[in-house]
Amino acid sequence: MARIFQPKKKTQLNTRHQAVQVERLDHHGAGIAYLKKKPLFIDGALPGEEVVTQLVEEKSKFARGKLIKILKPSDARVEPFCPHYHECGGCDLQHLNYDQQLTHKQQTLRQLMRKFAGSDIDLDAPVLGESLGYRRRARVSLFVDKKTRQLHFGFRKKQSKQIAQVTDCPVLAPELNVLLPEIYSVLKAFKKPDQLGHVELVLGDNGPCITLRHLSNLADDEVSALVELATRHQASLYLMPETDQLNLVAGEVPFYQEAGVKIPFDPNNFIQVNQAVNQKMVEQAIKWLDPQSDERVLDLFCGLGNFSLPIAKRAKHVVGVEGVAEMVEKASNNASLNQINNAQFYHANLEQDFDGQAWAAEKFDKVLLDPARAGASGIIDQVSALGAQRVVYVSCNPATLARDSQSLLDQGYQLTKLGMLDMFPHTSHLESMALFEKS
């Protein structure tokens, strides 16, 4: 006899307002309270606060609530400095004073390393820059309302694809922030605003750079308006049509200088968002790695050469390996530009075993890793085979750092230094650096 499928009835969500006590923050900065012994995550709530919340999601092991009202505020609560805070999905910790933000991030790093790597050491002093005006790059989203034909210009709303209208961003570098209202004014006069993709802003040492992604050809007067704007602000202008080909229309190729090295880049290349913290990060990595003039150093996930090239000025030989072929070519060109002859760069898939690669057959005294958020799980188990006595791991995700650290510890390394870098003030994003050594 055939069974007739009957879908389970959905559990009715109790949406009435409920008062709860917030106990702590999770690793992403959300407050955690408990409702019937189940963790309840509330964005915007702080430890010690009594708040009124409304359930928006309930699972078997956790629930999420919307912050409705704060009955008893924390002493650490501050008024957000940005008028777009409650809409924009960017700076999610503005309601927490900056010192407590740093404390929270350091506690998060230490807790994750203790839980997943079994390591508990004192942290080095955090690496800090300015807490405002620090972002040297941003992607501005564009969207045209089909009913009103109005162009929306700004950043994604929290946990949404919708756009918060933003023409003033306090964490954006002043040289870029001043461009926002003027770019919006120019773009909203375009004949086909629905054919615009997004705007990429980046600040090089030689000035700001504007990149417009567009899906159809622009009219001559539209290009002229953009060129006039860029020229007035001594900015470079790139146009990027559907072919993804970058076309430099005004100005020059952007670059930045780090530890005595000049690094040109295209506006769609990855560079660190916070220049001041990046500079200190490179300096600290070199200090911890301590490359000597008779040593060979391997830089995995090398990108444009942000670490490789400064290290090459101190080591006998540097090998940089990167998974994006275009970046490998640019790193090689950057080495030539800086007259660095002791650095070689290779393209390889660093998400899988690197046995058989020519560069991997060589031995190295020291290794630096700077992977993306996913970490280095594909290759981390092979680090010891490279012969390195010292490994510096730069991470933008403490969870994958903790996971990969366990592998390094299993290979006989000891964690001797650990520190947090506040690359993204007022957000829950956490950059960190760890030093592993073999005795």
Curated annotation (Swiss-Prot):
The keyword 4Fe-4S applies. S-adenosyl-L-methionine binds at residues 272, 301, 306, 322, 349, 370. InterPro entries: 23S_rRNA_MeTrfase_RlmD, MeTrfase_TrmA_AS, MeTrfase_TrmA_CS, NA-bd_OB-fold, SAM-dependent_MTases_sf, TRAM_dom, U5_MeTrfase_fam. [4Fe-4S] cluster binds at residues 82, 88, 91, 169. The active site is at residue 396. One of its GO terms (biological process) is rRNA base methylation. Keywords: 4Fe-4S, Iron, Iron-sulfur, Metal-binding, Methyltransferase, rRNA processing, S-adenosyl-L-methionine, Transferase. It is an enzyme of class 2 (transferase). It catalyses: uridine(1939) in 23S rRNA + S-adenosyl-L-methionine = 5-methyluridine(1939) in 23S rRNA + S-adenosyl-L-homocysteine + H(+). Its EC number is 2.1.1.190. Residues 10-69 form the TRAM domain. Transmembrane segments: none annotated. One of its GO terms (molecular function) is 4 iron, 4 sulfur cluster binding. Belongs to the class I-like SAM-binding methyltransferase superfamily. RNA M5U methyltransferase family. RlmD subfamily. HAMAP family: 23SrRNA_methyltr_RlmD. Catalyzes the formation of 5-methyl-uridine at position 1939 (m5U1939) in 23S rRNA. This is 23S rRNA (uracil(1939)-C(5))-methyltransferase RlmD. The gene is rlmD.
